[in-house]
Amino acid sequence: MSEDSQRNFRSVYYEKVGFRGVEEKKSLEILLKDDRLDIEKLCTFSQRFPLPSMYRILVWKVLLGILPHHQESHPMVMEYRREQYQDVYHALQVIHFISEATPKIEVFLYMYHLETGKLSQSQPYPMEPEDDIFLAIASTMEEMVDDDVDCYWLIRNFVNHFDSKFKDSKLQLHKAFEHYLNLEDSRLVAHLKASSALEKLPYDLWFKKCFAGCLSASSLQRVWDKLVSGSCKILVFVAVEILLTYKLKVTALNNAESINKFLEKIPEDNTDPIVSKAIDLWHKHCGIPAHSI
């Protein structure tokens, strides 16, 4: 039996006995053994599979450019990141901009503004729409990441990554959502149009905040795996699956305000299956990347 055949046989066996993901974890560990990490293969892996929790932060830091490709440099670079974090944090303390009572996600926002030259001296502090997006993402990232330094750098680079890499793609998400929802359930689209709700769905929550504050952090990290590794289209299929999952509830509502209000606060206890089905939908419509090793 060839090596590929053995791998396929083991994958099927593990899935049947309830150990789906064992082979995937082994594949990732092989990728992470190389001193020079292969970014393309890490991206492909992240597109195909959910990242194991024990490796997620490391992979995200590499894919978001917080850590370099060469692993031997990781300790030195991370020490530099830590020092930079402490310098910016201390600067905010010196100018009495933050205190021990300042909420952590607000500290992260002020640090980001100081680094990017946007820190305002006005009081109360002026909040722009993009700041609300930053805070929403920061709040969810804080639930995912224990270390403050890691958390800040991941928030900072995630926001920059989403704004720069997907600058053009973001403009198409609204249309793509309507297209794929219509393919899956045209009657549901017709109901949304008849209720004048289609143009008033919580698109900012979905496509700007990347579902931060909508899905539980434990579910959302599997969606963000796909974002970090290069696909913002996954957001479309999460939105589509939310509508499909709550079709009966949505079709029982007949005005835009009530539909929007419900979709902004969906029950968090059902978000894991929604994400799993959304990823399946994404693979169904967009294909599955070739195996990473």
Curated annotation (Swiss-Prot):
Cellular component terms (Gene Ontology): cytoplasmic vesicle; cytosol; lysosomal membrane; TSC1-TSC2 complex
Protein's name according to its UniProt entry: TBC1 domain family member 7
Molecular function per GO: GTPase activator activity
Gene Ontology biological process: activation of GTPase activity; cellular response to starvation; negative regulation of TOR signaling; negative regulation of TORC1 signaling; response to growth factor
Pfam families in the record: RabGAP-TBC (PF00566)
Major site of localization recorded for this protein: membrane
Keywords of the record: Cytoplasm, Cytoplasmic vesicle, GTPase activation, Lysosome, Membrane
Domain Rab-GAP TBC: 50-231
Function (record text): Non-catalytic component of the TSC-TBC complex, a multiprotein complex that acts as a negative regulator of the canonical mTORC1 complex, an evolutionarily conserved central nutrient sensor that stimulates anabolic reactions and macromolecule biosynthesis to promote cellular biomass generation and growth. The TSC-TBC complex acts as a GTPase-activating protein (GAP) for the small GTPase RHEB, a direct activator of the protein kinase activity of mTORC1.
Highest taxon in the source lineage: Eukaryota
Subunit structure: Component of the TSC-TBC complex (also named Rhebulator complex), composed of 2 molecules of TSC1, 2 molecules of TSC2 and 1 molecule of TBC1D7.
Classification lineage: Eukaryota, Metazoa, Chordata, Craniata, Vertebrata
Protein localization: Lysosome membrane; Cytoplasmic vesicle; Cytoplasm, Cytosol
Gene that this sequence comes from: tbc1d7
